[in-house]
């Protein structure tokens, strides 16, 4: 490129048409010319486009307030008020931090340069109580990429199993390989209690699926630029990698932590003196998980560095019969509504008597499967009738009774003709 000086021919900008005498500079290219004013205008357009793209990929979205997030969770998740409240605040603060980072700089406020640390979440509670569903619903409300990983499949680098970087690959896939969007997503790591250290004291033998995995997770939990193999599997030196910055990825790690309640109860029942002495209580609360302290998690088998990267700790409680009844009918996508919709697609109404719903909830409590077991029970009850209904055009309504659940009795069938006669007489 060359600057055009004075010449016999009067040259013009190929974009705005101004002559070389009307502008300060005219830059020549192969058969075209551009003036300094058009260059400046192009720079402004490029900056605006880049800023718009940055807003879309770095968290500049309509961030709902904690009460709005809580209200949305309330529409889908029954009970677990404390967990919903804690998650609403934690998620709001996380994405508020992401927004600050994208507009101000690397996690610093203007002037005082206060660094805003990331707050990942540890979710503790029995199986079937809605831990995974809470995280899925959060991601749905925020419209961010969401990935679920199983901690039991992970092993330390160099051993048979999955590397921790494969977790990030799932998030990238959930974002349709939009890395920038994935970098503000949510990763839910389940069964994290299964990677607890096998013994309270460090062992001289290698614990590749326990403490080793905790060590491997530290960096991505805290925030690092990880090299992710695009096809998954083990890394090898002759492959290309996707670079993913986990600084703004929210990690929600969860587990049932069976046996943790005994550790908490043992600590709460001890006597001592000084600042570390527990308060004496005559009896423990039913929700003993709500009393968990970092020292209990350490005794369970989580290393201190891992605990330190999960500053927000919240718990979910065992669901009782009343809560399970509400889960069947109240949420926007309640199980009963889902099955009623499936029957509607065959032109059949599905009705549940109150006694049937109570019996389904009682069975789930008895089996200790929580909300996850409700669908299995409904499949057992409705399976035979769902086999027959598509082939029988005479059926207009199916009524599930208590006997249908408890004694495997056939449901009450209302013929379509009877329903039509009742409608005409009405």
UniProtKB/Swiss-Prot annotation:
One of its GO terms (biological process) is proteolysis involved in protein catabolic process. Pfam families: AAA_2 (PF07724), ClpB_D2-small (PF10431), zf-C4_ClpX (PF06689). The keyword Transmembrane does not apply. One of its GO terms (molecular function) is protein dimerization activity. Keywords: ATP-binding, Chaperone, Metal-binding, Nucleotide-binding, Zinc. GO terms for cellular component: HslUV protease complex. InterPro entries: AAA+_ATPase, ATP-dep_Clp_protease_ClpX, ATPase_AAA_core, Clp_ATPase_C, Clp_protease_ATP-bd_su_ClpX, ClpX_bact, P-loop_NTPase, Znf_CppX_C4. Gene3D superfamilies: 1.10.8.60, ClpX chaperone, C4-type zinc finger domain, P-loop containing nucleotide triphosphate hydrolases. ATP binds at residues 126-133. Zn(2+) binds at residues 13, 16, 35, 38. Residues 1-54 form the ClpX-type ZB domain. PROSITE patterns: CLPX_ZB (PS51902). Belongs to the ClpX chaperone family. Component of the ClpX-ClpP complex. Forms a hexameric ring that, in the presence of ATP, binds to fourteen ClpP subunits assembled into a disk-like structure with a central cavity, resembling the structure of eukaryotic proteasomes. ATP-dependent specificity component of the Clp protease. It directs the protease to specific substrates. Can perform chaperone functions in the absence of ClpP. This is ATP-dependent Clp protease ATP-binding subunit ClpX. It comes from Clavibacter sepedonicus (Clavibacter michiganensis subsp. sepedonicus). The gene is clpX.
């Amino acid at each position: 490129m060359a600057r055009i000086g004075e010449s016999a021919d009067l040259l013009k900008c190929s974009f705005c048409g101004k002559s070389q005498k009307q502008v300060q500079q005219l830059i020549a290219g192969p058969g075209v010319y551009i003036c300094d004013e058009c260059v400046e205008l192009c720079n402004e357009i490029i900056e605006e486009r880049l800023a718009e793209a940055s807003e879309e990929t770095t968290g500049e979205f309509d961030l709902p307030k904690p009460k709005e997030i809580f209200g949305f969770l309330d529409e889908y998740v029954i009970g677990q008020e404390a967990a919903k409240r804690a998650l609403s605040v934690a998620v709001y603060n996380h994405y508020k931090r992401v927004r600050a980072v994208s507009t101000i700089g690397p996690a610093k406020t203007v002037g005082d340069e206060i660094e805003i640390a990331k707050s990942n979440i540890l979710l503790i509670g029995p199986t079937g109580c809605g831990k995974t569903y809470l995280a899925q619903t959060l991601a749905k409300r925020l419209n961010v990429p969401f990935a679920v990983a199983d901690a039991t499949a992970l092993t330390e680098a160099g051993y048979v199993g999955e590397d921790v970087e494969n977790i990030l690959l799932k998030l990238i896939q959930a974002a349709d390989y939009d890395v920038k969007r994935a970098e503000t997503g949510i990763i839910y790591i389940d069964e994290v209690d299964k990677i607890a250290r096998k013994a309270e004291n460090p062992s001289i033998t290698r614990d590749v699926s326990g403490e080793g995995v905790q060590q491997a997770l530290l960096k991505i939990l805290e925030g690092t630029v990880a090299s992710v193999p695009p096809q998954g599997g083990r890394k090898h030196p002759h492959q290309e990698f996707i670079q993913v910055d986990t600084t703004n990825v929210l990690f929600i790690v969860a587990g049932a932590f069976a046996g943790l309640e005994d550790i908490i109860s043992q600590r709460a029942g001890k006597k001592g003196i000084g600042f570390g002495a527990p308060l004496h209580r005559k009896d423990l609360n039913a929700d003993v998980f709500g009393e968990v302290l970092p020292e209990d998690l350490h005794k369970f088998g989580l290393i201190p560095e891992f605990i330190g990267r999960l500053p927000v700790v919240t718990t979910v409680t065992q669901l009782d019969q009343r809560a399970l009844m509400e889960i069947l009918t109240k949420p926007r996508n309640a199980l009963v509504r889902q099955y009623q919709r499936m029957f509607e697609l065959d032109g059949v109404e599905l009705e549940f008597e109150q006694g049937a719903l109570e019996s389904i909830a009682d069975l789930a409590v008895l089996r200790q499967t929580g909300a996850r077991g409700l669908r299995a029970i409904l499949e057992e009850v409705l399976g035979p009738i769902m086999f027959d209904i598509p082939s029988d055009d005479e059926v207009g309504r199916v009524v599930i009774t208590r006997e249908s659940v408890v004694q495997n009795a056939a449901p009450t069938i209302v013929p379509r003709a009877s329903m039509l006669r009742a409608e005409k007489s009405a």
